[in-house]
């Protein structure tokens, strides 16, 4: 009993240290996955793409398809190995895949290597969700997921300007080594993930983040029939499909969209994309705290989880449409930034509800939801690329973004966020009380 109490005390005392490291891994992952966006036209030229919009769109989409298809296997691995061990393995593999992508010789090799990196990253966020469900109680969970989402958004926000600055700084080295600067960028981006994996393994002990409560060998089998026939989970997956499809705009086509529709430079497109991303960071942080505050004040999952999601996604859709009618680029960016704020403000509900639904199988349920999200994220770049290739109108991407966010709001309006999918308690219920 004393050993169990000591473990519970270590979980409580170390939870924010674990959360900080998880946020750092999220930022690293999002910086790496957005590495192709800013130098997209350079890569297409150097690797002799036949059709820029179609070929680059298909590579971006392949990343998300690979990521989506590995979600459930990644979640299953996290539930079996525990978040600590699984996350370190995933991080090392995806960082090495990023390094290999620097040696791509053409469209096919880049597509395969980028898809491999996506597959390796697939287990990261099921692991993070499992960890948060393990160490945070219900009344603190939205702020924790909001901070994790902020880590993702920070990575996505700084990725464009970071890539643009690095690409400029790497010009002399590129000339000295007689190699393309985007290759050096990918090689450079592989380093933080490897360093993070070593730090996480050293700092976060099994006592701070236990694999799971109880004996893994006696864990009951997952009721897959209930999983695939649950209406609430179906709606949760649907909202993730549309939300992720919309938000991937910022990490794929947005810099190029600004270059094509507003005539800005590569560096300026990175800066403006980062500004929009900052709105997303602030939205994630404030949304998580606001959601938990509403839950403590009202005790209502409907208001605290569902309510802010409906308002956030609906407002985002409206603001994105309004941005199209602004002739001034800075007014347009301001509206898009506010739209990103609203989307991430409400977006924290998805992760929070998934952790609640998951009970003692958080990673599996979360990864199921995230799989559908990444199918949506995979379809958006290729659909946007196809629209531009067919019409030559880059503004259609903006309306595509607004449309999917509006549908996302409808999904949330129909979703009941209460209860757990398997009727069990959450892993944190007995050992992560505040």
Predicted regions, residues:
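Structural signature of the two symmetry-related core transmembrane helices
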Residues: 85-99, 302-321
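Extracytoplasmic gate region of multi-pass secondary transporters
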Residues: 36-37, 230-287, 347, 351
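Helix-breaking motifs and short loop linkers at transmembrane-helix boundaries and internal kinks
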Residues: 48, 82, 103-109, 120, ...
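Juxtamembrane intracellular "pre-TM" segments in multi-pass secondary transporters
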Residues: 4-11, 207-237, 261
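Helix-loop-helix hairpin linking two adjacent transmembrane segments in secondary transporters
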Residues: 148-202
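Conserved MFS/SLC helix-loop-helix module at the cytosolic interface between two early adjacent transmembrane helices
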Residues: 69-108
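Extracellular/periplasmic helix-loop-helix junction of adjacent transmembrane segments
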Residues: 39-68
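Cytoplasmic helix-loop-helix junction between adjacent transmembrane helices
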Residues: 113-152
């Amino acid at each position: 009993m004393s050993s169990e109490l000591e473990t519970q005390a270590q979980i409580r005392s170390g939870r924010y240290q674990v959360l900080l490291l998880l946020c750092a891994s999220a930022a690293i992952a999002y910086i790496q996955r957005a590495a192709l966006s800013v130098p997209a036209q350079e890569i297409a030229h150097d690797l002799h793409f036949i059709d820029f919009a179609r070929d680059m769109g298909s590579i971006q989409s392949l990343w998300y398809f690979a990521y989506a298809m590995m979600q459930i296997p990644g979640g299953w691995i996290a539930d079996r190995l525990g978040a600590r061990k699984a996350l370190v393995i995933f991080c090392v593999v995806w960082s090495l895949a990023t390094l290999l992508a620097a040696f791509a010789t053409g469209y096919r090799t880049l597509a395969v290597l980028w898809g491999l990196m996506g597959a390796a990253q697939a287990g990261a966020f099921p692991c993070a969700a499992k960890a948060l469900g393990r160490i945070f109680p219900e009344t603190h969970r939205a702020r924790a997921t909001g901070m994790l989402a902020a880590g993702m958004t920070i990575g996505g926000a700084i990725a464009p300007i970071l890539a643009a600055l690095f690409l400029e700084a790497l010009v002399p080295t590129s000339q000295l080594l007689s190699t393309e600067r985007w290759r050096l960028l990918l090689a450079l981006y592989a380093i933080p993930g490897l360093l993070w994996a070593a730090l996480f393994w050293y700092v976060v002990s099994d006592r701070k983040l236990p694999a799971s409560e109880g004996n893994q060998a006696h864990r009951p089998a997952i009721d897959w029939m209930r999983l695939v026939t649950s209406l609430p989970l179906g709606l949760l997956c649907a909202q993730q499909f549309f939300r992720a499809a919309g938000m991937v705009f910022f990490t794929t086509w947005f810099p190029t969209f600004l270059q094509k529709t507003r005539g800005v430079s590569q560096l300026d497109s990175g800066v403006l994309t980062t500004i929009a991303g900052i709105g997303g960071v602030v939205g994630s942080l404030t949304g998580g705290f606001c959601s938990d505050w509403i839950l403590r004040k009202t005790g209502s999952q409907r208001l605290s989880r569902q309510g802010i999601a409906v308002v956030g996604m609906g407002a985002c859709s409206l603001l994105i449409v309004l941005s199209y009618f602004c002739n001034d680029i800075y007014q347009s960016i301001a509206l898009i930034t506010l739209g990103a704020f609203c989307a991430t403000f409400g977006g924290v509900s998805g992760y929070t509800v998934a952790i609640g639904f998951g009970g003692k199988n958080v990673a599996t349920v979360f990864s199921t939801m995230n799989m559908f999200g990444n199918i949506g994220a995979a379809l958006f770049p290729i659909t946007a690329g196809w629209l531009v290739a067919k019409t030559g109108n880059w503004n259609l991407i903006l309306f595509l973004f607004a449309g999917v966010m509006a549908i996302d709001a409808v999904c949330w309006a129909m979703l009941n966020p209460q209860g757990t999918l398997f009727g069990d308690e959450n892993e944190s219920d007995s050992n992560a009380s505040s």
